[in-house]
Swiss-Prot record:
It is a multi-pass membrane protein. Keywords: Cell inner membrane, Cell membrane, Lipid biosynthesis, Lipid metabolism, Membrane, Phospholipid biosynthesis, Phospholipid metabolism, Transferase, Transmembrane, Transmembrane helix. It is found in: Cell inner membrane. It comes from Blochmanniella floridana. This is CDP-diacylglycerol--glycerol-3-phosphate 3-phosphatidyltransferase. One of its GO terms (cellular component) is plasma membrane. The keyword DNA repair does not apply. It catalyses: a CDP-1,2-diacyl-sn-glycerol + sn-glycerol 3-phosphate = a 1,2-diacyl-sn-glycero-3-phospho-(1'-sn-glycero-3'-phosphate) + CMP + H(+).
Length: 190
């Protein structure tokens, strides 16, 4: 349908847009006006929608690229980790920091593991599993609810979703580490 013009195509622009939106929602998060949580949540939601949309369009229009495959997960991590840090800083209690730090540690560990596997064996890679998709959904639900903070029930729903995301995060991390352990052991033996 659309002609491919090298690296810069619509899916790539959406990925770059997502990265550019991060400083915007950070700035809005700290605005000292009563509706800043709603605007911050709206910006985050729009950025999150582009995450789904850029992958869909890249596959649909056959505009996938190596740089897009590299930048897309980085844009996701930047957006999610920034939102998690803002939420942790806002609530400033251990029972929020615990799941948030667990999720951040997992994101860094799995990203490092992907890089390690790519260097050791380019034939194998860590593909996304259904569990990670469920984790991402719970995580996005938690982030939207906790950024928005409409009322007490929204915060409670956000905290429940955050702990659900943490459990799914740890489960998927164990799965990923187990699934690549044979590749890592082969590399260690060489």
């Amino acid at each position: 349908m659309f002609k491919y013009y090298g690296v810069f195509n619509i899916p790539m622009y959406l990925t770059l847009f997502r990265i550019i939106m991060v400083p915007c929602f950070v700035a809005v998060f700290y605005w000292p006006i009563y509706w800043s949580p709603m605007l911050c949540t709206l910006i985050f939601f729009i950025a999150a929608i582009t995450d789904w949309f850029d992958g869909f369009l890249a596959r649909r229009w056959n505009q996938t690229s190596r740089i897009g495959g590299f930048l897309d997960p980085i844009a996701d991590k930047i957006m999610i980790i920034t939102a998690l840090i803002l939420i942790s800083e806002h609530f400033h209690v251990w029972w929020m920091t615990l799941p948030i730090s667990s999720i951040i540690i997992r994101e860094i560990l799995i990203s490092s593991l992907r890089e390690c596997i790519a260097r050791v064996d380019n034939k194998n890679n860590i593909s996304v599993i259904w569990l990670s998709k469920v984790k991402t959904f719970a995580q996005m639900l938690a982030l939207i609810a906790l950024l928005c903070r409409l009322n007490e029930w929204t915060v409670i729903m956000g905290v429940i979703s955050l702990y659900t995301a943490m459990l799914l995060t740890l489960w998927s991390m164990c799965y990923y580490v187990y699934s690549v352990s044979s590749i890592l052991l082969q590399y260690k033996l060489k």
